[in-house]
C-alpha cells in the first residue's frame, strides 16, 4: 500500500511539473507574439507618419503654385492618393 501511494504521488508530482513547464512555454510564446505585433504596429505607424508628412508637403507646394491650376490639381490628387494609402495602413 505504501509503494502504491509513493507511485501515485510521484506520477502526480511529475504531471504537475510538466504542466507548469508547458504553461511557462505558452506564456513565453504569447509574449513573443505580442512583441511582434507591437513591432509591426510601430512600423505601420512610422510609414503612415511619413506618408502624411509627404502629403502635407505636396499640399504646401500646391498652395504655392497659385494660378497653375492643372499642376495644382495634379498635386492635390496625388496628396489625396497618399492620404488614402496612409489611412489604409492605419487599419
UniProtKB/Swiss-Prot annotation:
As given in the record, the signal peptide range reads: 1-22
Q: Which residues lie in the propeptide?
A: 23-49, 69-73
Task: Give GO cellular component annotations, separated by semicolons.
Answer: extracellular region
> Where does this protein have compositionally biased stretches of type Acidic residues?
31-41
Segments for region (Disordered)? 24-49
Which compartments does it reside in? Secreted
Asked if the Swiss-Prot or TrEMBL record annotates the protein with the keyword Amino-acid biosynthesis, the reply is no
PTM annotation (Leucine amide): residues: 65, 89
What are the GO BP annotations of this UniProt entry? defense response to Gram-positive bacterium
Q: Name one Pfam family in it.
A: FSAP_sig_propep
Tissue expression per record: Expressed by the skin glands.
User: Which keywords appear in this protein's UniProt record, sorted alphabetically?
Assistant: Amidation, Amphibian defense peptide, Antibiotic, Antimicrobial, Secreted, Signal
| Role, per record | Fallaxidin-3.1 shows antibacterial activity against the Gram-positive bacteria E.faecalis (MIC=100 uM) and L.lactis (MIC=100 uM). No antibacterial activity against the Gram-positive bacteria B.cereus, L.innocua, M.luteus, S.epidermidis, S.uberis and S.aureus, or the Gram-negative bacteria E.cloacae and E.coli.
- Family from the record: Belongs to the frog skin active peptide (FSAP) family. Dermaseptin subfamily.
Protein name, please? Preprofallaxidin-2
Source organism per UniProt? Litoria fallax (Eastern dwarf tree frog)
Amino acid at each position: 500500500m505504501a509503494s502504491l501511494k509513493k507511485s501515485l504521488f510521484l506520477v502526480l508530482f511529475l504531471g504537475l511539473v510538466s504542466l507548469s513547464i508547458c504553461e511557462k512555454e505558452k506564456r513565453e510564446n504569447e509574449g513573443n507574439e505580442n512583441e511582434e505585433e507591437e513591432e509591426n504596429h510601430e512600423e505601420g505607424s512610422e510609414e503612415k507618419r511619413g506618408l502624411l508628412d509627404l502629403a502635407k508637403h505636396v499640399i504646401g507646394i500646391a498652395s504655392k503654385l497659385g494660378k497653375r491650376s492643372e499642376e495644382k490639381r495634379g498635386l492635390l490628387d496625388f496628396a489625396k492618393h497618399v492620404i488614402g494609402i496612409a489611412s489604409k495602413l492605419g487599419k
